[in-house]
């Protein structure tokens, strides 16, 4: 049975994969994440998830390698990590009363036989109308400077939303576990069977 590798150094993705109670290792993929000028957000996350998984194939032959990538889209534009409090406030002002869509690309690459499975999962976050005071307090309390969209849905960010729409709530955090379980089963690695 091939061993499992998560092509990521993200603590959030690691924590999500740990929910499946299967043994895995993490490894940093080496991929240029620069978007191409002609790529849609869906195409970008699909390409990067695939490249991340395949980039580790020579280091991990005979493994199942998981690649994942996510972008946040508001008004047709990819929204990155804010990195500063002012940028976080600006992103939240733009999101207020709007829908922010997250696209998460998922790839499972079997480095033993070259079989690749991919999927893109959308997830919509409906923001309620936020006051300036609410935005300021949220940024001060949560410090979402390294989170695309300037919020942490798994934390205090839940207070910002009217509703969430998507197939799998784990997708919003960065790893669609329902889709991943389906892919793993197709490779003969059912999480429920050890």
From Swiss-Prot:
It is found in: Cytoplasm. Disulfide bonds: none annotated. Monomer and homodimer. Keywords: Cytoplasm, Hydrolase, Nucleotide metabolism. The record marks 12, 70, 154 as: Important for substrate specificity. The keyword Hydrolase applies. The active site is at 69 (proton acceptor). GO terms for molecular function: nucleoside triphosphate diphosphatase activity. Changing residue 12 to R: Decrease in activity. InterPro entries: ITPase-like_fam, Maf-like. It comes from Escherichia coli (strain K12). Its main location: cytoplasm. Its cofactor is a divalent metal cation. HAMAP family: Maf (MF_00528). Belongs to the Maf family. YceF subfamily. Changing residue 69 to A: Loss of activity. It is an enzyme of class 3 (hydrolase). Nucleoside triphosphate pyrophosphatase that hydrolyzes 7-methyl-GTP (m(7)GTP). May have a dual role in cell division arrest and in preventing the incorporation of modified nucleotides into cellular nucleic acids. Its EC number is 3.6.1.-. This is 7-methyl-GTP pyrophosphatase. It catalyses: N(7)-methyl-GTP + H2O = N(7)-methyl-GMP + diphosphate + H(+). It holds the Pfam family Maf. GO terms for cellular component: cytoplasm. GO terms for biological process: nucleotide metabolic process.
């Amino acid at each position: 049975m091939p061993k499992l590798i998560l092509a990521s150094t993200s603590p959030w993705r690691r924590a999500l994969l740990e929910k499946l109670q299967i043994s895995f290792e993490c490894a940093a993929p080496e991929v240029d994440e620069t978007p191409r000028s002609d790529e849609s957000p869906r195409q970008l996350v699909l390409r990067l998830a695939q490249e991340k998984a395949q980039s580790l194939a020579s280091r991990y032959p005979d493994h199942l390698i998981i690649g994942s990538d996510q972008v946040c889209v508001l008004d047709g534009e990819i929204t990155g990590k804010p990195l500063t409090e002012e940028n976080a406030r600006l992103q939240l002002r733009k999101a207020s009363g709007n829908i922010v869509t997250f696209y998460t690309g998922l790839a499972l690459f079997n480095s033993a036989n070259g079989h690749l499975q991919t999927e893109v999962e959308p997830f919509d976050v409906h923001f309620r109308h936020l006051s300036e005071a609410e935005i300021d307090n949220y940024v001060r309390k949560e410090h979402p400077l390294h989170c695309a969209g300037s919020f942490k849905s798994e934390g205090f960010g839940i207070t910002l939303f009217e509703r969430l729409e998507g197939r799998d709530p784990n997708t919003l955090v960065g790893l669609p576990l329902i889709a991943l379980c389906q892919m793993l089963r197709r490779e003969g690695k059912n999480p429920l069977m050890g």
